[in-house]
Amino acid sequence: MIFYFSGTGNSAWVARQLAHLTGDVACDITTLAHTPDVQKEEQVGFVFPVYAWRAPEVMTNFASKLARPQAFAFGVCTCGSEAGLTMKRFAKEYPLDSSYSLVMPNNYIIGSDNDSDAVIQEKIASARKALQQIAQEILHRQRVDRVHEGTLAGVKSRMANFGFNRFARTTKPFFVTDRCNGCGTCARNCPASAIFLKDGKPQWQAQCYQRMRCINACPTQAIQYGKSTEGRRRYTIEAHIPQEERC
């Protein structure tokens, strides 16, 4: 079983690709009502994005509740460039036999503009090649630690992550323009259930996971985050992969 948590689809796509290549099943943890039984699994995998150089809280909480059978355990984190100590920290919650980081298209539109179409296609093509190798290593139960931690990994995974969780998860800067048609896509897609509709317009709870699905997947590009996101490209992986690879 391969468990995943995803925002704009990068980690979902990676999990599904690995499931296909290894003959396994990919499962979105946000759809699970109960902690699954993995005692009979031959392999247990985790795929998730890097949030401020750590695994998302929702994924670490989920993993900490899972049983730890004799299955081969692996983790893949998707990131824009560096992973910091993400996998080492995650392995404290669920010990891993193999750990990987995989560069995928940028989606943190709050911090910087998303990648161009050309860069997106290049990153996805590189990821496809890397996933072939990762799948073979998993199938052969090879113990691998191929994580690009980057510079000052410890500082980033401690101080930057602390700052992110303390200050950056606020939803106050979110707002919608008059392009909003009240479709509710943002509310349906929010894994934290932090968005609800009031008078046909989205409203946010005080904090969220900063998964960026709402702002990137809004069909009318009506959602903004302060002034920083106006005019920036939106990104979801579905627009850049074949139909058969989409959710």
Q: Whereabouts are the PLM-identified features?
A:
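FMN-binding flavodoxin-like domain, especially the glycine-rich phosphate-binding loop
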Residues: I2, S6-W13, Q17-F48, A52-F167, ...
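A short, structure-level motif marking secondary-structure boundaries and short turns
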Residues: G75-V76, T171-K172, D199
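Short low-complexity, flexible loop/linker segments enriched in glycine and/or proline
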Residues: D113-N114, R211, A239-Q243
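A mid-sequence, solvent-exposed acidic-amphipathic segment
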Residues: G150-C183, A187-P191
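Iron-sulfur cluster-binding cysteine motifs and their immediate structural context
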Residues: F175-V176, N181-Q203, Q207-Y209, R213-E230
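Long, positively charged, glycine-interspersed low-complexity recognition regions
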Residues: Q221-C247
